[in-house]
Amino acid sequence: MLIREILEESVQKFGEVKAVKWLNRKEVLERSYSEMLRNVISIRKGLLAEDFAGKHIALIGTSSVEWIESYLGIITGCITAVPLDAALPCEELIDLINRSDSEALFLSPKHRPYLEAFLANCPKLQKVWMLQEEVEDLPSGVYSINELRAMGKSAAEDASCPDAEAIATIIFTSGTTGKSKGVMLTQNNLASNVEAVKISAEPGTAMLSVLPIHHAFCLVMDWLKGFSQGATICINDSLLHMVRNMS
């Protein structure tokens, strides 16, 4: 079974269950499994229409519903996702974008100050999508996530299901003992890790995601495993607020 199949099965079982909850200032926002899958499919179809099949796409940002929907839109098609540490300095992010052969980028609004440097120093970058629904005054080649979703909604063709041995994601090591290295994980690597951990949770069980989302453990055990159980993943916006958010 692939992540795409795990996600589709979860939506069939838990469609109206809340998949993600997060804080927007003081307001708690939610997105159901059905709503999330619709966005994932729109992103996936949009990327196919933009001719990114078989290519590498980087993501830079902290945990957000836009981040995880974009990641799933990438890996459930025939594209390789490259999640990068949002806390790295601009120069290191440029190096990782280039070394990973990423040809597109999903970027959080917090990292917009880096945008000009990325466009100037990452020659393979063709397009950048901001992980924000409404964005103004964007330079050429930069778009909002809403524009990609809209393209996907109007596209007739969907991406085929990826091969089990295709590279789903490249996750870079921390680089504490030298230059960070990109670890290639296949579709089967991700799915088998999700299926190998035997835990049971009632649909709608609230799970607080604390670790940075680009970490392999956080991605697989918090998000992908949680989705397989029909859990509600609650985004912790800051370690300083963790106790408050748990309540």
Task: Kindly give the residue locations of the regions a language model identified.
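Conserved AMP-binding A3 loop
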Residues: 30-34, 168-194
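Structural core segment of the AMP-binding/adenylate-forming
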Residues: 76-147
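Conserved structural elements of the adenylate-forming
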Residues: 37-42, 155, 183-203, 207-210
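Conserved pre-ATP/AMP-binding loop-to-beta segment of ANL
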Residues: 15-18, 130, 150-172, 179, ...
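Conserved AMP-binding/adenylate-forming
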Residues: 29, 44-88
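Flexible, low-complexity linker/hinge segments
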Residues: 1, 116, 136-167
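Conserved AMP-binding/adenylation subdomain of ANL enzymes
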Residues: 191-206, 213-247
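AMP-dependent adenylate-forming
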Residues: 7-31, 136
